[in-house]
């Protein structure tokens, strides 16, 4: 002990004379902790389960809507002959107000000039393009109607078609598939309409 009566090392308490911790109190604290933790985990799992159920219901509704839209589009006669032009999407960054306006005007003029020669070109040897292929034409029609592109891409993947061709309607049909697959695609369309 120092001159003030404080211990130099340790607490200065003789641990052999200290009474034991009450076991009932310790058990009560542990039980309370376990009960509160379990209640929290139960509430958390209930909230997660409700959110997953809501999400699953929304996915089912979207899938049903997509199937109905697919059936409606497949029931439209003459949809095989539909062709359309897709204008390229121009992305410009806004750095200066006048610079971005000038760039957008130039890009619009360039796209108008580019579209002229494309229309006058004739596909050599009557190659079937994606826009004229009946399997891809209905997906292009879905894009025009306003169906989300990701849903259309997923549908194309599920049917074994290349979703990248959705953005390139002037590209030739892969593997030279043409009129012989028209009958197969109409059979597959009727299998989706419930």
UniProtKB/Swiss-Prot annotation:
Any one annotated GO CC term: WASH complex
Residues bearing the modification N-acetylmethionine: 1
Location(s) in or outside the cell: Early endosome
UniProt keyword terms in alphabetical order: Acetylation, Coiled coil, Endosome, Protein transport, Transport
Family the entry assigns: Belongs to the CCDC53 family.
UniProt cross-references to PANTHER family, sorted A to Z: PROTEIN AD-016-RELATED, WASH COMPLEX SUBUNIT 3
Record note on quaternary structure: Component of the WASH core complex also described as WASH regulatory complex (SHRC) composed of WASHC1, WASHC2, WASHC3, WASHC4 and WASHC5. The WASH core complex associates via WASHC2 with the F-actin-capping protein dimer (formed by CAPZA1, CAPZA2 or CAPZA3 and CAPZB) in a transient or substoichiometric manner which was initially described as WASH complex.
Name listed for the protein in its UniProt record: WASH complex subunit 3
High-level lineage: Eukaryota, Metazoa, Chordata, Craniata, Vertebrata
